[in-house]
């Protein structure tokens, strides 16, 4: 029976799908770095960066990467569920799916608000006409990204690490790294914007572990891969 369950847990999708987490990490890191370098992290900034064409282009490039980032993350979630296989628990699976989908939703909402601000205020001078509108949109985008989005990322890390410990589908050290990173995101993300990079770095580690364990399983038991 144990051998049969092991066979069913072997990933059935193409192996290339497992790199979706690596793709997400690369895109999300690039997007975060671009927007952090171009726009101030302070939600009360006066919007001087809007008058610089180069900085505006950096922000637009960052925003254009986000849709692909979200798509890659959805595939990463599917890879994780496939890796868990029959060991998936309904209780934790509900939190896993909910936090992951809310993370993507909050990410897209933050980008939509930011893009709306850039379209409404083509330069720093236009902010002088309606400064309250700019500050409202800027604060909303900051809250969506740095409060709600990252808190959902922290919950996703907690529940994935918990599943990893309970089912042994992830190594113990990787689960503890997830708990540590999630706690940091949950407590101090609003004060240190660069800490948001912890989430894509953790996803990168998990993706590398899944790829390594998959290839290692194939090399030690090539027949099981053909059966799956």
Regions found by a protein language model. Give the residues of each.
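Hydrophobic, aromatic-enriched alpha-helical segments typical of multi-pass transmembrane helices
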Residues: 2-228
């Amino acid at each position: 029976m144990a051998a049969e369950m092991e066979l069913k847990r072997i990933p059935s999708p193409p192996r290339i799908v497992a790199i979706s987490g690596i793709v997400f990490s690369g895109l999300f890191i690039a997007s975060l770095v671009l927007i952090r370098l171009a726009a101030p992290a302070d939600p009360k900034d006066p919007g001087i960066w809007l008058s610089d064409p180069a900085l505006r282009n950096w922000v637009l490039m960052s925003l254009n990467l986000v849709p692909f980032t979200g798509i890659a993350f959805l595939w990463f979630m599917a890879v994780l569920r496939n890796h868990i296989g029959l060991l998936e628990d309904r209780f934790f699976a509900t939190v896993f799916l909910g936090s992951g989908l809310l993370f993507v939703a909050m990410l897209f909402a933050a980008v939509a608000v930011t893009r709306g601000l850039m379209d409404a205020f083509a330069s720093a001078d236009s902010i002088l006409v309606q400064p309250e509108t700019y500050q409202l949109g800027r604060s909303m985008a900051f809250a969506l990204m740095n409060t709600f989005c990252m808190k959902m990322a922290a919950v996703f890390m907690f529940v994935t690490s918990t599943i990893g410990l309970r089912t042994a589908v992830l190594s113990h050290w990787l689960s503890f790294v997830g708990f540590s990173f999630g706690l940091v995101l949950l407590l101090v993300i609003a004060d240190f914007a660069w800490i948001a990079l912890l989430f894509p770095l953790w996803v990168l580690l998990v993706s590398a572990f899944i790829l390594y364990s998959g290839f290692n399983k194939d090399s030690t038991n090539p027949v099981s891969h053909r059966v799956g």
